[in-house]
Amino acid sequence: MKGLVFLLGLLPTIYASLVHITPASEDDFYNPPAGFESAKNGDILKLRNSPNRLASFYFPIDVKNAWQLLVKSEDSFGNPNAFVTTLIEPYNADPSKVVSYQTWEDASNINCSPSYGAQFGSPLSTITTQIDMTLIVPPLRSGYYVVTPDYEGPKATFAVGRQSGQATLDSVRAILKSGSFSGINEDAKVALWGYSGGSLATGWAAALQPVYAPELQKNIVGAAVGGFAANITAIAESVDGTIFAGLITLALNGLANEYPDLKTAFYEELSDFAVPEFKAGAENCLAENIFHYPLHQYFTGPKRAFEKGWGLLKEDIFNKSIQDNLLIGLNKTYLPQVPVLIYHGTVDEIIPIKDPHAQYQLWCDWGIESLEFAEDLSTGHLAETFTGAPAALAWIDARFDGKTPIQGCSHTTRLTNLLYPNTSDSTHSYFLGIYQAVFGTPLGPGINGDNITINSGLLGLVSSII
């Protein structure tokens, strides 16, 4: 039995080694057409069916449709760009409800983009996207359309808040114009959701919306942010020298992709021995970089990569780019106008809870209309990904159902966010969704759970290999 389980666990890796899907960097679809600069932000520049089936933890999922859209947007400086967003239609979809899910891509290479990593047959390097896809399955089971944008944009600007938030909003604009092929209503309700790196994009989208996309306020019913990345400097301080140290070179390269002068400055300050791993951070996806560089010290310790230590980040060229990307550094103009849920583990080992606390207090002091903080006393960053998901799903369901959100601010602590109100159905949906994805059940409401298709789940994986 153990041998069978081991073999089944290897099947996704075996399949990925046998199939080749075109990386984003080699796919012309990602390149905007001539003259795209004149298009409006949120316009659809290109459209195609997903080149391959989508997968959840490397098992192909059965959905009615999946499209890729190339969407017009702009970078942090107002320069036009274009990014890909993936739109998924479940069976028996409700055209009035869409979840915009921002993945924790956390990488500075376009070949780590969710539009590529979510495809069946994507390489093992994109495993974090495949894990993240397990969170997309429950909304699909509920009949919600799901859109997941490559919010880091064509330059893969991990940790760059404005680019990430704007792309998230332009993705929403695009899908609200997609009715001719997707069936989505122009006045559809949209819930934003993201965890960890995805919370950075989601939080910035909620903050930028009143200024960047004011017309979307009538559509966006709320934003759920978990493992809330409000302060990127504090995250670097938290992970330097720990098993998660590889996050640092990913984030620094992401910032440097948006600020070219920053990359030159980083290399001038790097110790010679650290240059190869800094370059690797520009190529690796999240899991690979974490695996290769645990316990490395970049700003602390006697053999740190940057001799100046944390003092380096106080120098003008570094400090400005970092300050530009601190959500907590925005002024009151960017107070979210939609309900917000923050869910976070008290003992989060990557994103210290003091920073989500500070962001919560700031927004409350500014008079936010609805802000709920669900603190989980028992979990760290990784565990809260999954124990907090049912709370986010229950909260999103309530927003779609038109239930009145928290008025003003509310901060609650629980032993676990699995005890969040009305999570029994969403917890069941989450774990049943994993089961159904593995065994190939079509995703959508009113679907017979025994209706397994040969092209999806475990059977689809085996048949593809055979």
Swiss-Prot record:
**Which cysteines does the record link by disulfide bonds?**
112-285, 364-409
Where found, per UniProt?
Answer: Secreted
Gene Ontology biological-process entries: lipid catabolic process
Q: What is the effect of changing residue 196 to A?
A: Leads to significantly reduced lipase activity and impairs the suppression of IL-23 production by tissue-resident dendritic cells
Active site, per annotation: 196 (charge relay system), 348 (charge relay system), 381 (charge relay system)
According to UniProt, the reaction catalysed is: a triacylglycerol + H2O = a diacylglycerol + a fatty acid + H(+)
Entry keyword set = Disulfide bond, Glycoprotein, Hydrolase, Lipid degradation, Lipid metabolism, Secreted, Signal, Virulence
Read off the Gene3D superfamilies from this record.
Answer: 1.10.260.130, alpha/beta hydrolase
Which SUPFAM superfamilies has this protein been placed in? alpha/beta-Hydrolases
Q: What do we know about what induces or represses this protein's expression?
A: Expression is not induced in medium containing Tween 40 as the sole source of carbon. Expression is up-regulated during the yeast-to-hyphal transition. Expressed in alimentary tract but not oral tissue, during mouse oral infection.
Tell me which GO cellular component terms the UniProt record holds: extracellular region
What changing residue 344 to A does, per the record, is: Leads to significantly reduced lipase activity and impairs the suppression of IL-23 production by tissue-resident dendritic cells
- The residues the entry assigns to the signal sequence are 1-16
**Function comment:** Secreted lipase that is able to hydrolyze both the neutral triacylglycerols and the monopalmitate ester Tween 40, allowing the use of hydrolyzed products as carbon sources. Has broad lipolytic activity, which may be important for colonization and subsequent infection, therefore contributing to the persistence and virulence in human tissue. My be important for alimentary tract colonization, but not oral infection. Facilitates invasive disease via lipid-based suppression of the IL-17 response.
Database matches in PANTHER family: LIPASE 5, PTHR34853
Q: What name goes with this protein?
A: Lipase 2
Task: Name the species this protein comes from.
Answer: Candida albicans (strain SC5314 / ATCC MYA-2876) (Yeast)
Q: Which gene encodes it?
A: LIP2
